[in-house]
Amino acid sequence: MTYPIVLAHGVCRFDVLLKDTLNLDNTDTPELDNLHYFKGIRTMLKNKGYVVYHSNVAWAAGLEKRADDLKENLLNILKETRAKKINIIAHSMGGLDARHMMFNDRNDGEIHKYVASLTTISTPHEGSPFADWGLDNLTSLHSLIQKLGIDLSALKDLRTDTCKTFNEHQAVKEFETTCKDTTKFQTYAGKQNFWGVFSGLKIPFEIIRKTEGENDGMVSVRSARWRDEYFKGTMDKTDHLNEIGWWDPDQLLANEGPEELLQRIHNFYAGIAGQLP
């Protein structure tokens, strides 16, 4: 039987205002699960017999805080299920949360020993040129947001130079190489063209395209690969929101309606789950 699956969300989950009010993370109501960041994916996987949970980490916070939150999530799930290990399927920054969690806890609780697999979907392992651009060009806006008490530390942690420093840290490289013996790592990317990408992602799409090429409107294929040995493939005609089941009118240019997209994405996640330990 497959170990429990945790769906780890990205940096700014857009269902943040509804998740507590409607208990979206734990709902067993399909209609409510369709409002979740991972649109109906938990319900679909549960119907196939998997034990599935959602992560719940701080909105737009830095990686240290988010990694701690994710660790607490996993420990609670391990206690509740009495499972020996957990599978993580992470979208976007959720993959970085998991990597930092495993590394930070390597000499303490050794949470990595309880992670059977880490699958990342469009995770910016090499950072995001859009984060670089935002911090370099929108400093006044960023300062105003901070004065309002809104934590956007995640943007700094998503800078390309910050991610490069982490990836090239000798201790990180040695640790993650050792982890391959007990944890299955695999990565996926998404890509879309300018006309098909969600309207709100067209500016970051162009910023990323000019420096890193093919991307999904938030993360380049290059950044999502992590290591070539882990890379499983690219979802074509799929932007950053499509990857978690959310349709937008621009997708009509790919001749794909909302029901067709959702079914395709659900099939994608079901395929991943079917190969997990």
Question: In which residue ranges do the predicted regions lie?
Answer:
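Hydrophobic/aromatic beta-strand patches that form the interior of the parallel beta-sheet core
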Residues: V6, Y53, T119, Q186-Y188, ...
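A structural motif corresponding to the C-terminal end of an alpha-helix
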Residues: M44-V51, E174-T183
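Short catalytic/ligand-binding loop motif for oxyanion handling, primarily in non-cytosolic enzymes
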Residues: F14-V16, G62-L63, L96-A98, E126-F130, ...
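C-terminal catalytic-base region of ester-bond hydrolases, centering on the histidine
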Residues: T178-P277
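Active-site catalytic motif of lipid deacylating hydrolases and related acyltransferases
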Residues: M1-I86
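Catalytic metal-binding/acid-base residues of hydrolase active sites
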Residues: A58, G94, P124, A189-K191, ...
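Serine-dependent carboxylesterase/thioesterase catalytic core
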Residues: H9, D68-K173, D216
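Short secondary-structure boundary/capping segments
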Residues: T21-L24, W133-N137, L201-P204
